Amino acid sequence: MSNHDQLHRYLFENYAVRGELVTVSETYQQVLNNHDYPAPVKKLLGELLVATSLLTATLKFDGDITVQLQGDGPLKLAVINGNNRQEMRGVARVQSEIADDSTLHQMIGNGVMVITIAPTEGERYQGVVALEGETLAECLEAYFRQSEQLPTRLFIRTGESEGQPAAGGMLLQVLPAQDGNADDFDHLVQLTNTVKSEELFGLPANEVLYRLYHQEEVTLYEPQDVVFRCTCSRQRCADALITLPAEEVAQMLEQDGNIDMHCDYCGNHYVFDAMDVAALYTGNTGESEQLH
C-alpha cells in the first residue's frame, strides 16, 4: 500500500536532524481540475504543492503558508496555499504560450518568489527573494539560507502513479538549538538525494525510509492526511461585492442580468441576481446558493 496524499514526519535518533516525507495524487489532481495547463506548469504546480505541504508541516502554530512565483514571463503567476491542517489549494495564470520543454526561468522570466506566513493569531510575515537556482527546490533552499533559518534541504519529484498525476518530496532540517555536525547533515542529504519517484509514489513511508536510511535509527510518526480544500464561499463573494461602488454593481447587473463570480482555485461559480444584490444592501444575504 502506498502513502498517497499523506505527510509523514520522522526523526533521526542519533543526529540533530528531523525529516518529512509527503506524496500527493488526489490533491494534485484537484488543483489541476478545471484548468488546461501546459505540461511544465502542471509539473511546477506539483512541485509547489509538495514544497508548501513540507513547509506548513514545519509550523509550530495554527496558520497557513503561501508560496508564490510571479514574473514577467509567459507564466505570470503560480501559487499554492496550505495550512497546518494540510488543506491545500492552488492556481496558475498563463499569459502566453509555454513550450513543453520550458524551464522554471523560461516560464517565470524576471521574477521573484514570495513566501507568506500567516498565523491565525499574531503578525503576518512575508519574504520576497529572487529566483536563485535552476529548480524550485534550489530556490527554496536559497530562501532558507538568505533568511538565516535552520539548514534545510528539499527533494521534490513529480510524475505519474497509476495513470494519475503524482508528486512527492522530502525535507531535511537541522533541529534548533542543537550542536549538529555539518558532516552528519551532508551524509543524510546524500542518502535522501537517492530517492526515486517510483519509491515515493508506490511504497509505504516506512519502506521508503528503510531503503534510504537502513543503517540509521529513525522514528516515524503518525501520518497526516493532505487534502484539497478551497476557502471560497457565497458569503465571501457577497462580502467582496458589497465593497464595490453601488453604481458599478448596478452596471454589472444591467450588462449581464446577474453577477457570476468564479473561483479560480476550485472552479465554483456564485451567481447573484438583482434580488440577491438588493438583499446584500439590506443586510440579508439569504439562504439560497447557486452553484454551477
Swiss-Prot record:
- Asked if the Swiss-Prot or TrEMBL record annotates the protein with the keyword Disulfide bond, the reply is yes
Gene Ontology MF terms = protein folding chaperone; unfolded protein binding
**InterPro entries in the record:** Heat_shock_Hsp33, Heat_shock_Hsp33_C, Heat_shock_Hsp33_N, Hsp33_helix_hairpin_bin_dom_sf
Record-annotated disulphide pairs: C230-C232, C263-C266
Record GO biological process: protein refolding
Keyword set for this entry? Chaperone, Cytoplasm, Disulfide bond, Redox-active center, Zinc
Q: Name one GO cellular component term.
A: cytoplasm
User: How does the record describe the protein's post-translational processing?
Assistant: Under oxidizing conditions two disulfide bonds are formed involving the reactive cysteines. Under reducing conditions zinc is bound to the reactive cysteines and the protein is inactive.
What domain of life does the UniProt record list for this protein's source? Bacteria
One of its Pfam families is HSP33
Its annotated compartments are:
Cytoplasm
Has the keyword Nucleotidyltransferase been applied to this entry? no
| Record's function text | Redox regulated molecular chaperone. Protects both thermally unfolding and oxidatively damaged proteins from irreversible aggregation. Plays an important role in the bacterial defense system toward oxidative stress.
Its family remark reads: Belongs to the HSP33 family.
Q: Which HAMAP family match?
A: HslO
Q: Which PANTHER family match?
A: 33 KDA CHAPERONIN
**Protein name listed in UniProt:** 33 kDa chaperonin
Species assigned in the record: Serratia proteamaculans (strain 568)
Q: What gene codes for this chain?
A: hslO
